[in-house]
Every structure is written in structure tokens, then in C-alpha cells.
Amino acid sequence: MHATKAAGHRVIAVGTTAVRSLESAWDAAAPASDPAVTARGFEGREDGADVRGEGDITVREDATTNLYLMPGSTFHVVDALITNFHVPRSTLMMLVSALATRDQIIDAYEEAVREKYRFFSFGDAMLIE
């Protein structure tokens, strides 16, 4: 993740869970003095060790996150997202709205309704940049 960003490449997440996982991993590896991490609520590892600033770290496969991304959130890793059309007024809609402007989201959903796209888990997908 860090090498990809350092090389100037884009990170395109597939699914909202991937977005939250990647952004949470960045929080875990960010310098302890970074105010963006404090603002997002990073509390260190379960064992209390503060690993921030150690660069690339391995995140346990059973790790969890409480990261809530919404309009105004800063994305440090993810540049774009491929995701399905989510239910209005959901936390997933908030995450999607954090990556695009309100007008872009409204336009996409109006087209989806007009063109009879499928919604939810087995629906059509969109690319948000």
C-alpha cells in the first residue's frame, strides 16, 4: 500500500469493506503525531502497543475497525471505488458520498433509477473517482 502510493500509483478499492480496511491499515501505520489519525479515532492495537510510525505493518486477518467515513473525511489510501448502488440513508451511502460530490451521487442514482439499474448486493456497479 505504501509503496504503491509512494510510486504515484492509484489505489482503486473494490467494495466499501476494502475502503474501510485500507484506510484503517493506513491509520495503523501512520506516524503517532499525525493529527489526521487522531481525528479518525485510531487507538492502537489490542495489546496497547502504539505501532504508528513504524511504516508497513501486518494487520491481523481477524482485525476489526470502527472507522466511519462520511462527507468531509480525508482518504489517505483510496483514490477510487468500484461498488454497487447502496440504499439511501445508509452508512454505505455516506461512505460513497465521501468520495464524490453530492451532485455526482444524485446524478448517478437518477440515472440508475431511470435506466432500471439493479440495486443492493447483486446489483449493478459504479466507479467513483
Model-identified regions with their sequence ranges:
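Surface-exposed, charge/polar-rich loops and edge strands
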Residues: 1-129
